[in-house]
Amino acid sequence: MDYCSNCGSDEVSKAVPEGDDRARYVCGNCGAVFYQNPKVVAGCLPVWQDQILLCKRAIEPRLGWWTLPAGYMENGETLMEAAVRETREEACAQVEISHLFTIFSLPEINQIYVMFLADLIEPNFAPGVESLECQLYQEEKIPWSQIAFPTITQTLRFYFQDLKFGSFSQHVGDFLRRDGKLIMRPQLKSDGTEITTHW
């Protein structure tokens, strides 16, 4: 941060404000404190019969890679509204959300991913401005090596795992970097068991 958005001063530096426990951007001229919080990404796992709707990205990062429709929440909308909007924008698809499915924390990049299971109302879809193409895939046809983000790969794996078990869960976890590798750690209760909610 180079300038204070409150007074325009360039006397902005990181400091621990009084009563706080971590460094924030603080203006040395007017004293304004700037809090930067994680961004929320909301999206859908759209299902049509035994197929999943994927979008090929038309933008960086991961241009040309496959993903589920998802994106940043806008001010003034709910999580579900954001997920439905992103699906409409990226895949021109109409969905009906059925359940909250995954919540992933990515502290390294200050993001929270929230994905919903959703039913395609009808199999009508087309690439939006952020997609090169959209396609329905059965599990064995999914281009696993070309999935854009680990959060999307894990969401898809949880879906097919739950589908085999015959019931769906809410999955909560953290994506952390360990020894140079990004790993997914499930959220655990105090007794060490994984936090899941079945329906």
Model feature map: region roles:
Residues M1-G43:
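Acidic, metal-coordinating catalytic segment for phosphate/diphosphate chemistry
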Residues M73-F158, D162-S167, I183-W199:
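Unchanged
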Residues D2-N6, R178-D179, K189-T196:
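Small, basic N-terminal interaction modules of short regulatory proteins
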Residues N29, R57, A70, A118, ...:
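Active-site donor-binding loop signature of nucleotide-sugar glycosyltransferases
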Residues Q170-P186:
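A short, charged, Gly/Pro-tolerant segment at domain boundaries
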Residues Y3, R24, L45, L54, ...:
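Conserved hydrophobic/aromatic beta-strand scaffold that supports enzyme active sites
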Residues V47-R85, E89:
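Conserved Nudix-box catalytic region and its N-terminal flanking loop in Nudix hydrolases
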Residues R22, K39-V41, V47, P61-L63, ...:
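Short connector loops at helix/strand junctions that flank enzyme active sites
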